[in-house]
Structure formats: C-alpha cells, structure tokens
Amino acid sequence: MAGAELGAALEQRLGALAIHTEVVEHPEVFTVEEMMPHIQHLKGAHSKNLFLKDKKKKNYWLVTVLHDRQINLNELAKQLGVGSGNLRFADETAMLEKLKVGQGCATPLALFCDGGDVKFVLDSAFLEGGHEKVYFHPMTNAATMGLSPEDFLTFVKMTGHDPIILNFD
C-alpha cells in the first residue's frame, strides 16, 4: 500500500471505531526537533517513537515515549527482560516490512499493519498525565494526528496489541 492508501486505511479503521481526530499538516520532519516548531501550539502529549529489535533479530518493539524523553536502550532492555546490550535500532527495511512506514514515520498508529510480530511499549505518561489529546504521525511524517488517550488505547487494542506500559520517569 502506498502512503495515501495507508492513510485512508487508518482513517477507515478510526472511523469504524467512532474515533474523532485532529490532524495538522506540516512539512516532512524526520526528528522530534524538526517537528516541534510546527506542533508546539497543540496542547497534549507529543510522541517520540523508536523501532527496535533484539540482537538476534527475532523480536521487534515499537517504543512510544513523550517527545522529550531520553531513552537508555540498556535500561529499557533490562525492563523488557531481554538483557542489557541486546536492544538496537531496527533498519528501515524491517520497519517497512512490519509497519509499512519508513524512516521518520514510526508511529503506533501503524500497528494495524503488523501481523503480530511487533511488541508495543507505551510510556505510562500518555495515559496517566491527564492529557486531553495524544499526538502521533498518521502514517506520514508530513502530518500529526491528535486523539484522546482513551480512543488511542481502544485503537491499539483493536490492532491486537496489548501495550506494555512502562514508567520512564
């Protein structure tokens, strides 16, 4: 599926769940630093997404944290029970295969494309921070989509993923 088709497929799934979203288009961005000037006016929790694999390339994780978090992969590996030093960034080819999105577009909204190979790790601050909206890329890094934390969790569970919720404070 091409980018526009993926975006339409996402919108169809969200619509089927009666999930209301707010979308802001902006220039393509590849880092949180590039993104923030375009969306800092949006109130809520903004995301940073890491697509990771274990050393043996048998397991994949999509890790979604607040945009300003610094993540220690060794600490995260211990929390996930995979052993320090065993987590690394997956390449774009793996992300395209598993989530159908490329570099700069990692998003938990792409979990509907996964056939069950990707484990989803979510920063507890998205659910416990009292945020009116949480923001992610909608299958493209040229837009940002906001939805309520409750609707986001409903969507993630509809994809067949039970999030691993971790506290990153």
Swiss-Prot record:
It comes from the Eukaryota. SUPFAM superfamilies: YbaK/ProRS associated domain. GO terms for molecular function: aminoacyl-tRNA deacylase activity. Pfam families: tRNA_edit. Transmembrane segments: none annotated. InterPro entries: ProX/PRXD1, YbaK/aa-tRNA-synt-asso_dom_sf, YbaK/aa-tRNA-synth-assoc-dom. Coiled coil: none annotated. Belongs to the PRORSD1 family. This is Putative prolyl-tRNA synthetase associated domain-containing protein 1. It comes from Homo sapiens (Human). The lineage of its organism: Eukaryota, Metazoa, Chordata, Craniata, Vertebrata.
